[in-house]
């Protein structure tokens, strides 16, 4: 950790910390107290120590927290490259006390970033789910978070998301053709402002691999598990399967029956006597109204969880949007070799790899209102060899999406985004991405 050690040797405290009225929730404070006291099992001693200093942050005692964290960092600096748990704990805590010079140095050292990494806060007015990425003519990289992330206790999610994205950013920074300029990086489920994004449907949102695909190295663990435990096609059940949470709420929680995922479950229940569906809600999220929770639990639509490793027991896997595109669910479903039945997005949402997918070849398209779901499942049952081939094609396209290939494919996309925000008229959309007609 060369650059970290250099900063520690200088032993200079931060001088530009922004202090806001503390709005840490009671739940977060209690969690920190229990972590620090060792009441919560499964955490390391370093987590307990760091939690003690984060408690000081919650009380506004940033300088005392910083001093303690620097002592911890000095003691553990030599093991940081090897111990991801210690690294993440300290990265989060240093971000919270705004030792951004050390945050940048830790990221540079861990990922071999080719130049200085400057992390900053600014009143950008862009919201917590975005950050601004600037590349100067001399190769300096500056990542600016909106100061709103400092006003409550959500800093852990912000720095973790940034950390998970960093291999992609470091890969681009190492390219000789890397552009200069500024671009916004959307880090929410759907893009908020034109720039780089994980999921959207507008032409000025440039799609890149998401913060699930990148840190998992293209879901490497899923690939390995499924490769070792591949289920022969003839041993799979001729049933359309889905499990998922109640994401995708667009209006009042009282209107939960209008949720697309709820409608899917109700359609499946209507045809349950056919024996063709195993579909249900496996978790309630984004629902805080106790009456709505009770209604859903009493609806008969909530079924037990099924581990993703067992999805391959079914010949047909339904894929449906939640808050946005299904992210890991689609790729993992394709990797099983089962035939994916993809409910077309009612909002025309897409991810970076959607241009690779051909309907009726890699997946079976289902209408957004799912009016054709039963007929298509029945058709697949009658045309078993075709269904098997769709599953094989889907697995092949997913297996080809290695982390190495997708990082490299992201390079022209990121370059296009930088060029677009310099001069929108000079930009050409990369590898076939075209503006949505919707």
What are these regions (language model features)?
Residues 1, 58, 245, 269, ...:
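Residue-level marker of positions within ordered structural domains that often coincide
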Residues 438:
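C-terminal extracytoplasmic interaction modules
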Residues 37-39, 361:
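A ubiquitous short alpha-helical element
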